[in-house]
């Protein structure tokens, strides 16, 4: 059975957007229109929903919606005479492979999950032999190892998917697959398809600690939890990593991933990703929607800055006025870029879109600086007025 083609994913994306998803998910009521139009039997539709709703949250995200549509079309077009009892590996999204494995472990009592005829067998987790003194501190040596693994597996956006580290998992003789999934879920509470650099470093550190006989904790420190629970991953590779929780050094763990690092050498990835790649939607309508929202937020920031300036009872000096003028001109330029993008002239120019997004982030940072500058001037004015009133009394 062929994998999902790019044109097929884009077509499903148009249908998905037409159902007005909330938080990138649609409910059963919204999906029922599409499901019932297929004229399949109710028991078949129910089975399709059960197969597609991998995370069992009663809603379908875009990846799960693609699964639903493909299963429906295979039945309607006669490509399949009946529904499979479980999803084929080529239809399992890479971001949800660990959920499939966990479900199989619950129903079969086994942590074995086979993808593309490659089987990873989990060893028994001997809880009595594990220690509870888990150490969140990442030493410089370990950090260097983690960053090497990250650089070898991250995509062009600085993200790493769960299955892209399969080669590493195979070298961890003391870490069962269930603990690998637990560590991934700890650093990825929002269940994103991929995680950013800070999350990858902590994820690898948890695996390192587990390989050295430390029990994986059930919770992460509050500072890390706030970072990992953000709504949108940060792909800024220049951002400083999270500060260590304590200063205790980690004992000799330099052997972590040595065989894996030797194996990958200078290669970009240890293994090919498993499952369907849904990245075809990047650079299409969804990117335009994001850019449009960013421009709207930028306009709002400029409007607020202008209002604060108007009520400050004093005009900007020449420097701040010039900065504001430059921002407005740059905003106008980026708005024109968006218009061209929507008209189709720049639809396939992902480089220009990336430059526009970077420029928008720069403008937002500069607007923040301008607001802080205006606030400082306002505070100085208020302080001066208070001193004048004090002298008069």
From Swiss-Prot:
All copies of domain EF-hand, residue ranges: 40-75
Keyword NADP attributed: no
Residue runs in coiled coils: 285-392
Biological process terms in GO annotation: actin filament organization; endocytosis; endosomal transport
Domain EH: 8-98, 142-231
A Pfam short name: EH
Residue numbers spanned by region Disordered: 231-251
GO CC terms: actin cortical patch; endosome membrane; plasma membrane
Keywords: Actin-binding, Calcium, Cell membrane, Coiled coil, Cytoplasm, Cytoskeleton, Endocytosis, Endosome, Membrane, Metal-binding, Repeat
InterPro entries tied to this protein: EF-hand-dom_pair, EF_Hand_1_Ca_BS, EF_hand_dom, EH_dom, End3
Complexes and interactors: Component of the PAN1 actin cytoskeleton-regulatory complex.
Family: Belongs to the END3 family.
Described function: Component of the PAN1 actin cytoskeleton-regulatory complex required for the internalization of endosomes during actin-coupled endocytosis. The complex links the site of endocytosis to the cell membrane-associated actin cytoskeleton. Mediates uptake of external molecules and vacuolar degradation of plasma membrane proteins. Plays a role in the proper organization of the cell membrane-associated actin cytoskeleton and promotes its destabilization.
Protein name, UniProt field: Actin cytoskeleton-regulatory complex protein END3
Taxonomic placement: Eukaryota, Fungi, Dikarya, Ascomycota, Saccharomycotina
Gene: END3
């Amino acid at each position: 059975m062929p994998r999902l083609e790019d044109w097929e994913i884009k077509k499903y994306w148009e249908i998905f957007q037409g159902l007005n998803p909330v938080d990138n998910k649609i409910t059963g009521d919204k999906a029922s229109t599409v499901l019932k139009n297929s004229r399949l039997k109710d028991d078949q539709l129910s089975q399709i929903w059960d197969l597609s709703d991998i995370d069992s949250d009663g809603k379908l995200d875009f990846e799960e919606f693609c699964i639903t549509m493909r299963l429906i079309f295979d039945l309607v077009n006669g490509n399949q005479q009946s529904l499979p009892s479980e999803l084929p590996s080529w239809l399992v999204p890479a971001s949800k492979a660990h959920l499939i494995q966990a479900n199989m472990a619950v129903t079969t009592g086994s942590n074995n999950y086979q993808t593309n005829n490659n089987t990873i067998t989990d060893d028994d987790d001997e809880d009595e032999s594990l220690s509870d003194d888990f150490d969140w501190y990442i030493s410089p040596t370990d950090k260097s190892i983690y960053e090497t693994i990250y650089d070898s597996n991250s995509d062009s956006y600085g993200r790493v998917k769960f299955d892209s580290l399969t080669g590493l998992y195979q070298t961890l003789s003391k870490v069962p697959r269930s603990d690998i999934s637990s560590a991934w879920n700890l650093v990825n509470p929002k269940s994103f398809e991929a995680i950013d650099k800070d999350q990858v470093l902590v994820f690898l550190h948890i695996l390192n600690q587990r390989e050295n006989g430390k029990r994986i904790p059930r919770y992460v420190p509050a500072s890390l939890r706030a970072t990992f629970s953000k709504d949108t991953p940060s792909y800024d590779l220049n951002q400083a990593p999270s500060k260590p929780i304590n200063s205790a050094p980690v004992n000799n763990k330099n052997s972590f991933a040595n065989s894996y690092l030797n194996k990958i050498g200078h290669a970009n990835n240890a293994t090919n990703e498993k499952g369907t790649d849904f990245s075809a939607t990047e650079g299409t309508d969804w990117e335009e929607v994001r850019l449009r929202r960013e421009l709207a937020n930028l306009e709002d920031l400029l409007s607020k800055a202008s209002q604060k300036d108007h009520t400050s009872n004093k005009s900007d000096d020449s420097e701040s006025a010039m900065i504001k003028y430059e921002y407005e001109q740059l905003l106008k330029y980026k708005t024109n870029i968006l218009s061209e993008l929507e008209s189709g002239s720049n639809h396939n120019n992902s480089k220009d879109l990336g430059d526009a997004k970077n420029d928008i982030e720069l403008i937002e940072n500069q607007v923040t600086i301008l607001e802080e500058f205006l606030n400082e001037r306002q505070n100085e004015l208020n302080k001066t007025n208070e001193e004048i009133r004090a002298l008069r009394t």
